[in-house]
């Protein structure tokens, strides 16, 4: 447990008797629902229609339940996607006006030279091209300004998934050279996101990555953030497949105190408590590997078979865990690896979404989630279409979602999820 402490303590300084005392008292998720992202619901419509075309009403209804009822985090993975914060704020305010109490989950994910080990989710910023300064001024600052301006809403923000994992275990020169500047970048984000309506969770990878005793040592990042910086806690298992709790740990977990994510939160939380650091966790269960799906813990890409996991709840049976929730939207590919036919990272992988539905947690009910907003159909979109263009032909419902570079033709995306930098990106206005 020595490696994670050094990084975390450095990010939140120890200049006062209890420098990491939470700014907000209590669990920010209690009494609230996790924001249901209409854009994710749109992507799932393709999955629902695929089941309906085969006469599979049961799985189509399970998809509709997810569309209507299951909240997910919104990933802000580049500068362009900062506009998705505005969409989330608008939709969350609409939900609030209907008497709901949403907490908006956002993932801050744009460090320069990110994903230095795997490379499947490398981003737009490079340290050798002024990346750290751009991260601060073009990404973190507007991100923070948008959230602070929406003081009528509550936000849970996950900070830089996998970054600490790569800092602890990354052995390449590329990872080693990125470590210091990335720590500075995360510390800056923590500083900028200090507000009573913002609840910060610093990502600590997962039990299979950092849960071994020799790796559990977080501290440097927290010192760098300064003595007035506060975080609520940590996120784990983001975009991974570990179960929250299991009575039958797979053989590859032998010898680890973190055979599942609840145990990881306990073992790491207890060690953090001894050092005066926060001990609260949120744990991603958007996708969970089925028993026997993996031969080793390091398998992380489009693992098959897997299913949608436990949807949002604060009934965690672990005092260290604030909530079980969905961070990674199931159906978005991890990269061109794992299950056959996988597209590049972030692109919609409908065959995978169908598999997740078929193997879904029992709480994903086959009644469609009645009582919520109707599931979006092909003509329903969370983004207002341009009045000068009409989708047609082979266009998908999400045709107005993306902002391409240099495209002056019709605002119409070909079939597929339109996201920045994927194969459909350049087709959209």
UniProtKB/Swiss-Prot annotation:
Residues 378-390 have a biased composition (Low complexity). One of its GO terms (cellular component) is extracellular region. Disulfide bonds: none annotated. One of its GO terms (molecular function) is hydrolase activity, hydrolyzing O-glycosyl compounds. SUPFAM superfamilies: Cellulose-binding domain, Glycosyl hydrolases family 6, cellulases. Its main location: secreted. Residues 240-261, 362-390 are annotated as: Disordered. The keyword Repeat does not apply. The active site is at 115 (proton donor), 162 (proton donor). It is an enzyme of class 3 (hydrolase). It comes from the Eukaryota. This is Probable exoglucanase GH6D. It comes from Podospora anserina (strain S / ATCC MYA-4624 / DSM 980 / FGSC 10383). The gene is GH6D.
